[in-house]
């Protein structure tokens, strides 16, 4: 086995870490990077499924896409979750409940808006009873487009959220 050919496949960041470890016997990093890495790798999400997008959201957790392999596990309580996925049409009557559930989540908390209805009202945009985007009620971190968005689109949105968490300071939001 030729070791030089294998080293060409290793990203530069890992080469630097391996070099530091072989020289010193330990690796130094900032606490902020460690916290962000662990947060991004262990997202606990809860569903706020309001319409047909929730079916696609459930499909993402099934064996074909297996969201848990990316470190995202479902939780039944807002007090145990740090990501809320709002999927579907948000009505004026449901908006206070959404805000109440969001307020029960511990910090840091993130929101993914899934589908055209959650993003901006969608097909029902001009209805008197529909909120024109859940970002009017709670701050949204990631928007997943589509009507309904595919399971792959939601998976991509979660991966983008993990990337956003890794790149952001843990003590500022």
From Swiss-Prot:
Keyword Metal-binding recorded: yes
InterPro entries: NADH_UbQ_OxRdtase-like_20kDa, NADH_UQ_OxRdtase_20Kd_su
Keywords assigned by UniProt, alphabetized: 4Fe-4S, Cell inner membrane, Cell membrane, Iron, Iron-sulfur, Membrane, Metal-binding, NAD, Quinone, Translocase, Transport, Ubiquinone
Organism ancestry: Bacteria, Pseudomonadati, Pseudomonadota, Alphaproteobacteria, Candidatus Pelagibacterales
Protein name: NADH-quinone oxidoreductase subunit B
Pfam families linked to this entry: Oxidored_q6
Broad class of where this protein is predominantly found: membrane
The protein's required cofactors: [4Fe-4S] cluster
Assigned EC number: 7.1.1.-
Reactions it catalyzes: a quinone + NADH + 5 H(+)(in) = a quinol + NAD(+) + 4 H(+)(out)
Residues given in the record as [4Fe-4S] cluster binding sites: 52-53, 117, 147
Cofactor note: Binds 1 [4Fe-4S] cluster.
């Amino acid at each position: 086995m030729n070791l030089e050919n294998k080293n060409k496949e290793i990203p530069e960041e890992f080469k630097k870490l391996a070099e530091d470890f072989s020289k010193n016997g330990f690796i130094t990093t900032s606490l902020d990077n460690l916290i962000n890495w662990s947060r991004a790798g262990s997202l606990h999400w809860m569903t706020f499924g309001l319409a047909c997008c929730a079916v696609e959201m459930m499909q993402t957790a099934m064996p074909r896409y297996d969201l848990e392999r990316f470190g995202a596990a479902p939780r039944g309580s807002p007090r145990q979750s740090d990501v809320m996925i709002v999927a579907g049409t948000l009505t004026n009557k449901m908006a206070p409940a959404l805000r109440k559930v969001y307020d029960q989540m511990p910090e840091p908390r993130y929101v993914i808006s899934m589908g055209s209805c959650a993003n901006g009202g969608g097909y029902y945009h001009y209805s008197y009873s529909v909120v024109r985007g859940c970002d009017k009620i709670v701050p949204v971190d990631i928007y997943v487009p589509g009507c309904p968005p595919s399971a792959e689109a939601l998976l991509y949105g979660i991966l983008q959220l993990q990337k956003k968490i890794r790149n952001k300071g843990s003590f500022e939001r």
